[in-house]
Amino acid sequence: MQKLTTSIRKMQGRKILVIGDMVADVYLNGQIGRISREAPVLILQQVDEKIVPGGAANVVANTATLGGEVFAVGVLGDDKYAEKLRGLLETYGVHIEGLVTDESRPTISKVRVIAGGRATVSQQVVRIDNESKEPLAKKIETQLIAKLDAILPQVEGIVLSDYGSGTITENVKKLLLNYAQKNKIPSIVDSRYDVGRFGGVGYVKQNDTELAAFVGRDIDSMGALIESGSELLRKTNASAVLITRGENGMSLFERSGAVHHIPVSDKSEVFDVSGAGDTCVAAFILALTGKINPINAARISNYAAGIAVRKLGTSTVSFEELENATNK
């Protein structure tokens, strides 16, 4: 454990580019008042509204709180959520000059309505998503590429955080992967729906559900996991694939054929898995850019994700929390 504690100090100050679908995660808390006369629904009196970085913006935030110097690249609308996200990321010390404004589309938002009463436990009753399904306009893509051309020479690692909302176009993807390969810097993709299009990336992170969707079959045994993880590794031609498996920990597949299974760091007090994958990616890329080998990078990521799941909602993990966890 002492080795990991020493290793994580190499993560500090690493310059990381995070590009992807920036999301405003909104938590709207309300107190149950009465039944509406208009329809058989509850009337909630809004108590507060909390907005936190979600999607790729959560990767940005976690990379920053874990000690990285982060350059955020993505597309926001011209609305209150864009303004709030920019402000939040600035408070983390993030470089936000790579965020492009597209007035034709809203900032992606996921509004969770949470209802409760004085004698009841608060719980989420509905989620309202708002995003454009239209492809990025050519002029917006051109602006993104110009931002990348300016930022890439400054960074040591690249994260592609693809939530399926179209920020990482084919041209953007090619630019990033070619740059990473040419300059021999680590790149990692976490793609919710289409990881197969990222062939040539350095590293791949998926959860077990995403892996099952990619291979088109259930992963119901260790044999199925090994077969599926190896298939993803082969088809993406990555250096390694990291699969997060919930309460079963993580599995790292390396090009050498080695497979490492890492148990969860702490099975107690799992409150919420929201955003834990983003924390995992943030820790992994920081470790890789700190010249930490992939297996130890995965172990560090496992500790970081273990801290994240013990927090309610989308959240960040600090370097101090990670250091304390690896010291235990």
Which residue stretches match the model-derived regions?
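Structural motif
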Residues: 17-19, 127, 156-159, 188, ...
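Active-site metal-binding loops of divalent metal-dependent hydrolases
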Residues: 22, 163, 279
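Flexible glycine/proline-rich, aromatic-decorated loop/lid segments
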Residues: 34-41, 201-209, 249-277, 323-326
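Extended, hydrophobic alpha-helical segments in both membrane/secreted and soluble proteins
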Residues: 159, 176, 187-189, 193-197, ...
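Conserved phosphate/ATP/ADP-binding segment of small-molecule kinases
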Residues: 165-259
